[in-house]
């Protein structure tokens, strides 16, 4: 450590190096513990790096994926059932439904569940047919609307073609006028003087 002493006008406090040494020795021996830069008896707490807690991933909400699969499988089974019933038997009419209801009324045995199942199957088949007819009506309406859109688009395209043709004809007529004036200048040597009528404004 380097010590530097500045010479001041008032040097009455220390006159000799021996006094400086004695003063430093006394101050070093009689120093306070609070003044020590590196005290030995002070316990320094160990600084551990803060570790983030390992976040446990949240469990996703229990989704019923199996139910979707089951619904799809049920729909496939119902469609296959409808296809097989359509192939094997004609569509149930009103008379078939009346006969099945009459059979239910006449049958007094313990097997009451079987005729009800047959009636419900007939209703399901009938509702599937009504759904198919609704789908057919919707597709027919969509086809009609598409045809209307196509006719409108074709009308717009023909109008645009007519406009382009008119623009081409205008350009062609202006080109022919320029060619005729050029030919007149070549043959006669100078352009004809044409007097333009000036319109007078009435006040």
Swiss-Prot record:
Q: Which GO terms describe its biological process?
A: viral DNA genome replication; viral transcription
Residues that the record marks as modified (Phosphothreonine) are 84-85
Q: Specify the inducers.
A: Constitutively expressed in abundance during viral replication.
Q: What is its main location?
A: virion
Q: Which UniProt keywords apply?
A: Elongation factor, Host cytoplasm, Phosphoprotein, Protein biosynthesis, Transcription, Transcription regulation, Virion
Q: How does it assemble?
A: Interacts with the DNA polymerase processivity factor A20. Interacts with B1R kinase. Interacts with the late transcription factors VLTF-1 and VLTF-3. Interacts with the late transcription elongation factor G2. Interacts with itself. Might be part of a transcription complex composed at least of G2, A18, and H5.
Q: Which family does it belong to?
A: Belongs to the orthopoxvirus OPG110 family.
**What is this protein for, i.e. what is its function?**
Involved in the co-transcriptional or post-transcriptional endoribonucleolytic cleavage that generates sequence-homogeneous 3' ends during late transcription. Involved in postreplicative transcription elongation on intermediate and late genes. Also involved in DNA replication and in multiple steps of virion morphogenesis. Required both for inclusion of virosoplasm into crescents as well as for maturation of immature virions (IV) into mature virions (MV).
Q: What is this protein called?
A: Late transcription elongation factor OPG110
